[in-house]
């Protein structure tokens, strides 16, 4: 910043050759030095700005006038004749913005070279053209509109120089290739800006600052943003707003309209103080007639009691009967072991079931008496029903375990009590090991006899009335890391009929096959 400020305050003076007149660049530099030497009227302002406007006012240079009109009126070009009158061209729409792009880049448009050469007044200054931009778009008075004016210097490009070479060599004189190259080199030397080869760092800093100030608003993102709000873009949006949206943009159009509709709504919500408002809900009369009578049977729900299977007579056991079925398999290099326990308590004709993961150290627990070997919670037990239902539960659970594990399943059966399930329904055969534990009344200890392995057939469950287990339930039992908490098994006193409310307190009705059969009957 210090170097740039010093260059602004004390610019070096240049030495010009005595022969020839000054170019437009030399005039601008002399004007810059002159303005730097003057004291500004306000200390915070600088005088060495708007040099091109000051040069045009001092020497009354001829300019190319570009008029920018508001709305859809477009823009036009205007040239001054010898008599001082201005001749304006036709107005072009803003959609034809090729000429405006050249003006924005401060380059001489090639399409205007022939037109400017044929003008009555010499408008070229060392190959450059001074353009005056008159912007009528910011004027508020439409009857006598004013304009904002600024000047830009349109410099020649290689394309315009080639056009000049072609126009000069298009006469009847024969031009060789060397003559054309020599003419092109002379045109470049005549129109090029003065070259500064000063090794001072101030030159680099000043050039970078000038380039930054010129290009800071001409970046690609800024141009894209300006083009979005240009007149041509607004006209295109206005035309497309009257057309029906394409099928791909119906949702976007609906959201845009809803957003505009919500933005136009204004709600004047005022919160009154406590005590100043009237609760109209409380003041509204409540005309509710009390019914003279209520049809209870219409709204009452009768729940039937549990009915056991009539195919087999009801057997009241004299002792607790407990059957343990242990399923073992190795699925995906992981050992899995689950246990299905079926229990019939003393004085209760119904069978109850429970499924839990089984660990290796629970084999010793199976040798204990039924009163000590199970201390599970009542919520873990579910009602099965009759003996036929219990056999069906065993078969279905065995199939589900085998389908889940996708490998051979080994089932071992241990029974305690006076009676047990006789056999499993016929079906596919699975290797099973049966272990029977018989209690001795004399010794008071359970003596376990292990007979040789036998093959027990198992049913596929197709003949059963319903499935008691789902594959999701089986996988949850197989993947459970620890067994659930345990307490004493449920017992129901001897009665001729079992009340449904008492049974629901002991086990969940959703897991009960008896409750499922009840739903089928209802």
From Swiss-Prot:
**Record keywords, A-Z:** Developmental protein, Gastrulation, Phosphoprotein
ATP-binding keyword on record: no
- The answer, when asked if Metal-binding is one of the entry's keywords, is no
In this chain, the stretch annotated as Disordered covers: 361-380, 408-522
The PTM Phosphoserine maps to 284, 507, 512
Q: Where is the composition biased (Pro residues)?
A: 481-492
| Example GO BP | gastrulation
Q: Which residues carry this modification: Phosphothreonine?
A: 482
Record's Pfam families?
Spt20_SEP
Query: Per the record, where are the segments of Low complexity compositional bias?
Result: 412-425, 458-467, 506-522
UniProt GO cellular component terms? SAGA complex
According to its UniProt entry, what is the function of this protein?
Required for MAP kinase p38 (MAPK11, MAPK12, MAPK13 and/or MAPK14) activation during gastrulation. Required for down-regulation of E-cadherin during gastrulation by regulating E-cadherin protein level downstream from NCK-interacting kinase (NIK) and independently of the regulation of transcription by FGF signaling and Snail. Required for starvation-induced ATG9A trafficking during autophagy.
Please give the family membership noted in the entry. Answer: Belongs to the SPT20 family.
What is known about its subunit structure? Interacts with ATG9A. Interacts with MAPK14.
**PANTHER family per record:** TRANSCRIPTION FACTOR SPT20 HOMOLOG
Name-wise, this protein is Transcription factor SPT20 homolog
Source organism per entry reads Pongo abelii
- Name the gene for this chain: SUPT20H
